[in-house]
């Protein structure tokens, strides 16, 4: 991806007839943090995280309760062998369920985060193209691909404004 961006950048620089190319850049992180779309996507991700955490806490409480019973010698001695074995089995099963739940949590959060970023990048591309054509720029690059550029070429604020306008129309 970075090689492709760099190659595209070199191609744009090489294809301009003048020594000075008219370029801009966008800060994707700012778009994610400051745009209404980015804020909404972040809120949804946080809500998803909170739901997972709440459910995990319930399982943790139950695991702790069973663990404490298993560690209490007096309690364990008062149980029949079958009840004692059943409690151990319940602890093992619940531990496995908890581990599977945590794995599902991380996988779901990662997938949601990737989708969130992909969605934002698609919207930023549309907004960047609008700014590029309006301001007659050769290209708008991702800030991470730019090592040095003249002051005043940051188009992030303009792109965030377009993202917010588009978000308001859609909602």
From Swiss-Prot:
It comes from the Bacteria. The keyword Signal applies. GO terms for biological process: chaperone-mediated protein folding; protein stabilization. Disulfide bonds: none annotated. GO terms for cellular component: cytosol. SMART domains: OmpH. Residues 1-21 form the signal peptide. Keywords: Signal. One of its GO terms (molecular function) is unfolded protein binding. Belongs to the Skp family. This is Skp-like protein.
């Amino acid at each position: 991806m970075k090689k492709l961006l760099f190659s595209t950048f070199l191609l744009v620089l090489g294809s301009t007839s003048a020594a000075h190319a008219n370029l801009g850049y966008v800060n994707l992180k700012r778009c994610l943090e400051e745009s209404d779309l980015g804020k909404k996507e972040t809120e949804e991700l946080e809500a998803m995280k909170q739901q997972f955490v709440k459910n995990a806490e319930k399982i943790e409480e139950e695991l702790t309760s069973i663990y404490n019973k298993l560690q209490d010698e007096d309690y364990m001695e008062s149980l029949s062998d079958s009840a004692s074995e059943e409690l151990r089995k319940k602890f093992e099963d619940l531990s496995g369920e908890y581990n599977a739940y945590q794995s599902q949590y991380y996988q779901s959060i990662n997938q949601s985060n990737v989708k969130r970023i992909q969605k934002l990048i698609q919207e930023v591309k549309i907004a960047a193209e609008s700014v590029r054509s309006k301001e007659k720029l050769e290209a708008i690059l991702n800030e991470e691909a730019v090592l040095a550029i003249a002051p005043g070429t940051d188009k992030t604020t303009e792109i965030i404004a377009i993202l917010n306008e588009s978000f308001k129309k859609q909602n």
